[in-house]
């Protein structure tokens, strides 16, 4: 009996020893396997538990005061809530912790509810796409996007403005200690900041000089404390600054317009070389081929009015290269006597083997009035583009091409990207002009009648509506036969003469075109003609790629230095920069 009791005591002591030393052994092994990052997380978890005991105790008291105990909230997750492939490792670790807490909460529910909980836990495990564990030494933090900010830069520039303002408050010739220190700190800070626009561009020296500047500004605020005088001075400074900004804007706009009106040196050089080459040819060699197709109505006829060699070349080349049947194309290039030799020589040197090209001199035709140039000068515009004969000669198309019934009118600042032959199959429904409308508010191409036309005039207000839908030149399908029936050229001449006597519309061919073809236009799908590449319009790249014709309307033409670089590439691919004349005139992409 004593032997049995002794063995019982030994067994009990052994079990007690195991219960004491076993946890120590397991915990020590666990701590050895924890990485430095894991130890830091373990300590952070302990600190969170230590500081949240009071909250837990208060929460327990609140539950006791309630009507009854509530079970744990069962959180259901959807497939869309777990997208580990698009998140960082740190984000997945954070989500894994939440899932462990949720599972542990569910395991504490009574056994009666286990049948409902276990399928939910299994569903959670099946739907979750877990990432592999973090490697040793890898940071367990969320990846922050690297965004360049300018908060500190703006703060520093604000302090520079404050310092300049305080210096303006100082009496003339003042040489006090505060003024000296303010000038010194201002020079140092301006030199350190330089032209930085983002915080990443700031040097360490600039950041170190912020605190001394703040101290000097505080001293200056104690010295210059006459608030009414300071307010008056600040208002004067604000007014002067606004005047300077407005003057700079006006100057920039003027220079932009001046650049748009000026012929680049390279283009002038090219025209001179081509003109010289043209007059060195024998008269019989100046003739273009396939002249029998000029007035054949079975062909697809295009017309462009231009005084620019490269611009007209791009329009012709892009149209032919985009066509499925280039042999059916007849292209009429209408220019003036000054540019006729250069443009003729260019197309003689670069003859299109399939299409037919005709070069016309508007000055050799008898379709325009003799005093047309003087009438155009009465439009009170200094911009030669608006008072150009070529710009208004489009209203005489039925007289220029008496043997044709339908044609497509293209401006010389467009690029054709799609086959345009389908335009000839469009039913015009008795209309004269097919065009893309520009009357949808909110779009970059939006234009209103009231912006360009003077509806305060009684004659205009009684005949036209300011809410009528506008449309654009640039790519237009013209029914010349219907034009002749409605005698719209006579209508244009009538309106033009009225406009020379009193201001009825802004200079240019677009406003008078709206009036001449009022209610005579057919709306085309906007993908036929996308505008805005020659100005700040924000046209979408998708719209450009899908467009049949893209239009560089505005002053930022692709052949000018002020053209938008991201849009020039559509134009440059149709310019033969390898040509000898272009290289000699230093014309480059």
UniProtKB/Swiss-Prot annotation:
- Transmembrane segments annotated in the record for this chain: 7-27
Stated membrane topology is: Single-pass type II membrane protein
- Tell me which tissues or organs this protein is expressed in: Expressed in roots, inflorescences, siliques, leaves and stems.
What is the annotated signal peptide range for this record? none
Tell me which parts of the chain lie in the Cytoplasmic compartment: 1-6
Tell me, what's a Pfam family for it? Glyco_transf_8
Keyword Iron listed? The answer is no
Gene Ontology terms: cellular component: Golgi membrane
Question: Where is region (Disordered) located?
Answer: 127-151
Query: EC?
Result: 2.4.1.-
Q: Which residues are glycosylated?
A: 83, 126, 317, 454
Q: Which residues lie on this side of the membrane: Lumenal?
A: 28-589
Quote the CDD domains the UniProt record gives: GT8_like_1 (cd06429)
Compartments annotated for it: namely: Golgi apparatus membrane
Q: Which UniProt keywords apply?
A: Cell wall biogenesis/degradation, Glycoprotein, Glycosyltransferase, Golgi apparatus, Membrane, Signal-anchor, Transferase, Transmembrane, Transmembrane helix
Q: Where do Basic and acidic residues bias regions lie?
A: 136-151
What is the superkingdom listed in this entry's lineage?
A: Eukaryota
This protein's pathway = Glycan metabolism; pectin biosynthesis
**SUPFAM superfamilies (UniProt xref):** Nucleotide-diphospho-sugar transferases
InterPro entries named in the record = GAUT (IPR029993), Glyco_trans_8 (IPR002495), Nucleotide-diphossugar_trans (IPR029044)
Identify the Gene3D superfamilies for this entry.
Spore Coat Polysaccharide Biosynthesis Protein SpsA, Chain A (3.90.550.10)
User: Which example biological process does GO assign this protein?
Assistant: pectin biosynthetic process
Q: Mostly located where?
A: Golgi
Q: What does this protein do?
A: Probably involved in pectin biosynthesis in cell walls.
Describe the family membership recorded for this protein in Swiss-Prot or TrEMBL: Belongs to the glycosyltransferase 8 family.
Its name, as the record gives it, is Probable galacturonosyltransferase 6
Q: Which organism is it from?
A: Arabidopsis thaliana
Lineage in the entry? Eukaryota, Viridiplantae, Streptophyta, Embryophyta, Tracheophyta
Gene name for this UniProt entry: GAUT6
